[in-house]
């Protein structure tokens, strides 16, 4: 009883080197042919190369998810090339930003636009293609823990991820009559595990941001006397019951299963792979990581990356 996506064709939007690339790789490793979109053509091509060096089949379909003609264009390209589309992962998003006192209208507008039109236009045109061709497809929107609860310093992100969550439930109702499923997956600050990303940016996987871009949530970015801190900066208690919120590989396993026929009746739902982080009551502080048994070993997907890393050690 193996989960298999053999014969299925997937489109993953925003297939940048972290979560998008991880999901695209997972879909390929489970047998799907994958079309990797990104507004950054190099990011899309890099995701394709990662899939190919792991033995999968992929093409790059660069484009802006907010541009309807471009969405229709890359959908057509995928259909001409592979004859069908069974899976859509709406992953593209603008991360970061600032708090409500400091965010600019331009950033807020664009961040909301990428999430809103990205999810809408891709779900509309690819869902319509699936419906017209009798394909009982699976659509997965990538949300965030910030879509379910509040953090300081990410007001645009909180707004659009909250929107994504109910978009999924409504789109699930629209597409249920066609046998097409719509669900969300909620990442919770996974630890990057793409070897190329780590080689380029270090273990955290993020480029060091200038002070001015660090959230604007309190005294850190402003010297005004009225500013108050919004984030605890002292020693941190353990936050995650199982000690880790996992990696993009963990996300990929879950999304691949969600796109398989095993989940044929799952629609309008949200999934987390977060070591219990979201289930935790606010007043409960988990044990220290060193005292935990830890999760079962990760089943790796980037096999050549693992081998390369072992060889270079
Ligand atoms: N990294 C995290 O800790 C985290 C946590 C929770 C949720 N998420 C979500 O996971 C997803 C991926 O996050 P990530 O960490 O890999 O971020 P990322 O910034 O590395 O990837 C997002 C990609 O989307 C692309 N993109 C942006 N605008 C686009 C557009 N208009 N058209 C096409 N592509 C566009 C970017 O170029 C980028 O490659 C996002 O939806 C994000 O909100 C991430």
Language model regions located:
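Canonical Rossmann dinucleotide-binding motif of NAD(H)/NADP(H)-dependent dehydrogenases/reductases
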Residues: 3-34
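C-terminal substrate-recognition "lid" of short-chain dehydrogenase/reductases
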Residues: 4, 82, 120, 242-273, ...
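Short, small/polar-rich loop/turn modules that mediate ligand/substrate recognition or access, typified
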Residues: 89, 176, 181, 266-268
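Substrate-binding pocket helix/loop in short-chain dehydrogenase/reductase
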Residues: 99-112, 236
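Active-site helix of classical SDR
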Residues: 123, 160, 168
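Alpha-helical segment proximal to the catalytic Tyr-Lys
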Residues: 128, 173-177, 264
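Residue(s) in the substrate-gating loop at a strand-loop-helix junction
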Residues: 144
């Amino acid at each position: 009883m193996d989960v298999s996506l053999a014969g299925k064709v997937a489109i993953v939007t925003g297939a940048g080197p972290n979560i998008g690339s991880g999901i695209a790789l997972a879909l390929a490793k489970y047998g799907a042919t994958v079309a990797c979109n990104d507004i950054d053509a190099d990011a899309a091509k890099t995701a394709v190369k990662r899939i190919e060096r792991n033995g999968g089949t992929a093409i790059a379909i660069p484009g802006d998810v907010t541009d309807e003609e471009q969405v229709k264009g890359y959908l057509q390209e995928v259909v001409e090339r592979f004859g069908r589309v069974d899976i859509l992962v709406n992953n593209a998003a603008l991360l970061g930003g600032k708090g409500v006192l400091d965010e600019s209208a331009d950033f807020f507008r664009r961040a909301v636009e990428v999430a809103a039109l990205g999810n809408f236009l891709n779900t509309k045109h690819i869902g319509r293609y699936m419906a017209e061709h009798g394909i009982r497809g699976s659509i997965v929107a990538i949300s965030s823990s910030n879509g379910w609860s509040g953090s300081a310093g990410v007001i645009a992100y909180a707004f659009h991820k909250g929107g994504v969550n109910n978009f999924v439930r409504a789109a699930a109702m629209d597409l249920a009559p066609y046998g097409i499923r719509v669900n969300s997956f909620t990442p919770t600050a996974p630890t990057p595990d793409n070897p190329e990303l780590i080689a380029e940016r270090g273990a955290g996987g993020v480029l060091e941001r200038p002070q001015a871009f660090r959230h604007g949530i309190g005294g850190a970015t402003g010297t005004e006397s009225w500013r108050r801190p919004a984030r605890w900066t002292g020693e941190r208690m353990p936050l995650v019951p199982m000690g880790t919120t996992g990696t993009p590989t963990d996300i990929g396993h879950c999304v691949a299963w969600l796109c398989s026929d095993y989940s044929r009746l799952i629609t309008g739902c949200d999934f987390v792979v977060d070591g219990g982080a979201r289930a935790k009551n606010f007043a409960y502080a988990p044990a220290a990581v060193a005292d935990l048994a830890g999760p079962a070993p990760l089943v790796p997907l980037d096999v050549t990356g693992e081998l390369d890393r072992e060889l270079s050690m």
